[in-house]
Amino acid sequence: TDGHGEVNITQAMAMSCDVFFYKTIQQIDIDKLHTIFRKFGFGSKTNVDIPNESKGLIPNKEYLMKRYGKYGWSRGTLLNLAIGQGEILVTPIQVLNYINLIATKGNSPSCHFVMVDNLPSNSKPELEDNHWEQVYKGLRSAIISKKGTGRKSDPAIDGFKVYGKTGTAE
């Protein structure tokens, strides 16, 4: 195939263009990436109402150096992190919280299985409105664009918009 060609963030999200994210992550410090993941609730417990909840794993430089040694982790390790694979471990409830944070621009209570008043809030990632809009545009394009990886998921119901992102579990 000819590949995706040159794409912007919206197209990269819609077409699930790994190369775009490989190039992007090489411009971000691993510890900065770790901080961003943590702001969205990954790498820490959600305190959902189930025993023995795992916090998952979002690797930082310290973790990678301890695991692989000073020069042991490769660019490939970093590239895998860009697409949510490799050393990343997340729980289904963390993914649910993440989607809720995106859907509400960070104004989402944390998820619980038991109904209670005054639910604690998720961490609120501070993003500029144009960043939220880029995310929404990419998630919508994954469903409605001709090259979107989720294009067959649109129910085409008036007044009902589906947003989504396909992915590959490791």
Language-model segments: what does each one mean?
Residues 1-170:
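Beta-lactam-recognizing serine transpeptidase/beta-lactamase-like catalytic domain environment
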